[in-house]
């Protein structure tokens, strides 16, 4: 692995400082060009470096931090459900903000991938799309949540529209769950991909929440089609005509 000096442009990487830029050498038959580019980007990502310094399990933690700094929807004393929680970055951030503890956990996460234990977090190792998952989440939390978070995304195929549709489906399922369980005035945050097929989802969110925002935090890579839908202040008294998104 070759290291060269590169000047950063500020942010988490430092303000106008110099850092070592790491290049990955290609050995015949060992790594593709696209994989090498991804690895170089990952190794030189200032958010990746900062996550190690701050003890977060992923750079995604900063996406939630940045969104909350702007909209301040996470507060001390809230109850949180985190869908697609692996490797645990969002659970770490939300748990710290709401003051969750092992004695009185306020955060419940779920993922089919294993997540190592986190202080103040109850983690369910199961697929959220399983029919038993919604009730198990509520049972684990012991009450309705104030906030439902979802950073779920389907494995990418490389085909932009296919990836968008698959991730929007997960967002729809997460939204339906949120509409079913949130406390009055609760909030919903979920990952989506830009692609134009989320009109039904947006209509439903606007009918059931006071405000809905499209958010692309600085920690989301500029070239990524990723964005987040933030729905604030759940209108619990709104009558839902039907369950639009089925598990």
Curated annotation (Swiss-Prot):
Keywords, sorted A to Z: Cytoplasm, Methyltransferase, rRNA processing, S-adenosyl-L-methionine, Transferase
Catalysis performed (reactions): uridine(2552) in 23S rRNA + S-adenosyl-L-methionine = 2'-O-methyluridine(2552) in 23S rRNA + S-adenosyl-L-homocysteine + H(+)
Active site location: 191
Residues annotated to bind S-adenosyl-L-methionine: 88, 90, 111, 127, 151
Highest taxon listed in the record's lineage: Bacteria
Gene Ontology cellular-component terms listed: cytoplasm
GO molecular function, one term: rRNA (uridine-2'-O-)-methyltransferase activity
Main location: cytoplasm
Enzyme kind, highest EC tier: transferase
Region (Disordered): 1-21
Entry EC number(s): 2.1.1.166
Cellular location(s): Cytoplasm
Function of the molecule: Specifically methylates the uridine in position 2552 of 23S rRNA at the 2'-O position of the ribose in the fully assembled 50S ribosomal subunit.
Family in the record: Belongs to the class I-like SAM-binding methyltransferase superfamily. RNA methyltransferase RlmE family.
Identification of the protein by name: Ribosomal RNA large subunit methyltransferase E
This protein's encoding gene: rlmE
